[in-house]
Amino acid sequence: MAEYGTLLQDLTNNITLEDLEQLKSACKEDIPSEKSEEITTGSAWFSFLESHNKLDKDNLSYIEHIFEISRRPDLLTMVVDYRTRVLKISEEDELDTKLTRIPSAKKYKDIIRQPSEEEIIKLAPPPKKA
């Protein structure tokens, strides 16, 4: 599934080295410390998760959980969008399934979007100096 590969690449492109350390820390129970040192890129992290059955194209709940507890709503939103668009699992459906651990992920969708014209606060120009 090409969309899955694209999702992982997009996520990898948005994960810095600092982010990676935080993500590895968030799932330290699932990554032995000696393996953690070998994981030095986002793609290596995703590969590790796939090889340990924590991630696949039809089950993204683990990384949704990690992105939420790591306070990365931008990454979480990318995963939720993929799940809704590609897997055709709506936010209502997810409440009835075990495909996600964190059904509250939908709360982040509004954070990422751009405000409408009505929502933009227009400031008055600064006062003129006399």
From Swiss-Prot:
Alphabetized CDD domains for the sequence: DED_PEA15 (cd08338)
Alphabetical list of PROSITE patterns matching this protein: DED (PS50168)
Protein modification: Phosphorylated by protein kinase C and calcium-calmodulin-dependent protein kinase. These phosphorylation events are modulated by neurotransmitters or hormones.
Keywords, ordered alphabetically: Apoptosis, Cytoplasm, Phosphoprotein, Sugar transport, Transport
Location of the region described as Microtubule-binding in the Swiss-Prot/TrEMBL record: 98-107, 122-129
Effect on the protein upon substituting L123 to A/R: Abolishes MAPK1 binding
Consequence recorded when altering K129 to A/R: Abolishes MAPK1 binding
Pfam families in the record: DED
Residues where Phosphoserine is found: S61, S90, S104, S116
This protein's GO CC annotations: cytosol; nucleoplasm
SUPFAM superfamilies per record: DEATH domain (SSF47986)
Top-level taxon: Eukaryota
Disulfide bonds: none
Compartment(s) of residence: Cytoplasm
InterPro entries according to UniProt: DEATH-like_dom_sf, DED_dom, PEA15_DED
Quaternary state and interactors: Interacts with CASP8 and FADD. Transient interaction with PLD1 and PLD2. Binds RPS6KA3, MAPK1 and MAPK3.
Entry protein name: Astrocytic phosphoprotein PEA-15
Organism from which the protein derives: Cricetulus griseus
